[in-house]
Amino acid sequence: RVLGYSASKAAMENFTRWMAVEMALKFGDGIRVNAIAPGFFIGKQNKDLLLNQDGSLTERGQKIIRNTPMQRFGEAEELNGPIQFLCSDSASFVTGIVLPVDGGFSAYSGV
């Protein structure tokens, strides 16, 4: 259903890994390359797809929540912690990862 979107996400993940290797080989630990993979966050772009006018979930919104172990959408502020971690000295030996911030959506198999 969303071939272009899926292909672009896969490309970004592979690019992140490739760039991490290239930068580490050229600059050692001076440049780290990581990414975050946000799950479902309600914003202007998707609000009408996920919420009805009265604020209840659309069919698509319900399906997403059913497949998100934390049973909710993310809040934009919840991206701050993972970003700060990846930029901090605590992640000084972390490079080439794509960190999901998705309430467990990517880990859930529906079982």
Which residue ranges define each predicted feature?
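Active-site loop-to-helix junction immediately N-terminal to the catalytic Tyr of the SDR YXXXK motif
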Residues: R1-A7
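Conserved SDR Rossmann-fold cofactor-binding beta-strand/turn motif
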Residues: R32-I42, C87, P100-D102
